[in-house]
């Protein structure tokens, strides 16, 4: 069945989604999910197979994924006072296969461990395999048109909410294991902390996201700072792209006419912590990204049955103004 997508991020311009599910594949309650998202410039294909296990044991999921997206966050070119980013002619193809183990959820904590084999390839806009960007700089760590890696990932989530406040923590640790020569060896860490509290009729929401990476690195693995889910008022990755980063978001919402319509004011700040020069090929430095920046503005939130419709009017450090339109889940805002 074709459904409209409510997601944000690489597939925010989704044309359609195809999803097929089988709840009892081999007669033993095995579940098979197949999904395909197609955007104007992006595609994402996922096959997930789950076997039934007792609730007190790890839940297993076997995954096969393929995605193709324009690599704008790192290799894109900022324009219009960094308020937009346009393609640099580099597209990222990511094919992975692996298994995911999810621990039985506690009262507030949940943990997921996964291992996957990943093949990352670089393509031009016309579909050709490429090794270098427009400046002749290698796009991969290996120097080939692709990188291979085995990735061990541990993700822990904490969530607690009531009528007056909410707290969310997300910790991700990835370890690259070089099983063969030229396979990547690295450690990548990312943390997001979100705190919200009710202040009279208003609600204040603050979040801090940070991360760092050591070891082998392809330029496409850099942390991209800037954009709708990062620092509003900037294009995707227009603030910077580095081995490390820090982003802080603050937003205050107040009911306008009812709980279904809210006004918001916000301030965002992001920085690559001076690590842009540590990314192979210096893509952020070559594209003259500032490395740090802030955005501020105001907006309106419409809480609809399908999700939350957001309209944001932002101004960045260069005083360029941008209007954002997005649709997402209320719980993820």
Where do the PLM segments sit?
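Gram-negative/organellar outer-membrane beta-barrel architecture
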Residues: 1-161, 165-170, 204, 225-232, ...
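Extended beta-strand-rich architecture
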Residues: 4-5, 15, 148-299
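Membrane-interface anchoring segments and C-terminal beta-barrel signals
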Residues: 297, 305-306
């Amino acid at each position: 069945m074709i459904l409209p997508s409510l997601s944000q991020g690489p597939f925010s311009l989704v044309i359609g989604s195809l999803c097929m599910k089988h709840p009892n594949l081999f007669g033993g309650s095995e579940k098979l999910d197949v999904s395909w998202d197609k955007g104007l410039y992006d595609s994402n294909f996922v096959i997930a197979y789950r076997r039934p296990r007792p609730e007190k044991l790890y839940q297993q999921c076997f995954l096969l994924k393929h995605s193709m997206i324009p690599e704008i966050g790192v290799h894109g070119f900022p324009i219009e006072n960094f308020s937009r980013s346009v393609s640099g002619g580099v597209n990222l193809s990511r094919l992975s296969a692996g298994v995911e183990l999810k621990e039985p959820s506690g009262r507030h904590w949940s943990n997921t461990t996964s291992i996957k084999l990943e093949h990352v390839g670089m393509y031009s806009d016309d579909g050709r395999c490429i090794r270098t960007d427009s400046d002749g700089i290698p796009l991969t760590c290996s120097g080939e048109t692709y990188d291979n890696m085995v990735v061990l990932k541990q993700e822990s989530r904490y969530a607690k909410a009531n009528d007056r406040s909410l707290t969310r923590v997300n910790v991700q640790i990835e370890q690259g294991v070089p099983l063969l020569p030229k396979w990547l060896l690295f450690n990548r860490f990312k943390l997001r902390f979100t705190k919200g509290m009710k202040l009279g009729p208003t609600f204040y929401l603050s979040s801090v996201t940070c991360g760092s990476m050591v070891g082998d690195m392809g330029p496409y693995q850099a942390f991209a700072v800037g954009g709708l889910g990062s620092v509003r008022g900037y294009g995707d990755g227009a603030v910077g792209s580095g081995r490390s980063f820090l982003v802080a978001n603050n937003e205050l919402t107040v009911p306008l006419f009812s709980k279904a319509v809210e006004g918001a004011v916000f301030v965002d700040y992001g920085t690559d912590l001076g690590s842009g020069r540590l990314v192979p090929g210096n893509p952020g430095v070559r594209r003259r990204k500032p490395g740090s920046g802030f955005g501020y503005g105001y907006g309106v939130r419409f809480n609809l049955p399908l999700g939350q419709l957001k309209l944001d009017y932002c101004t960045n450090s260069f005083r360029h103004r941008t209007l954002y339109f997005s649709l997402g889940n209320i719980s993820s805002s």
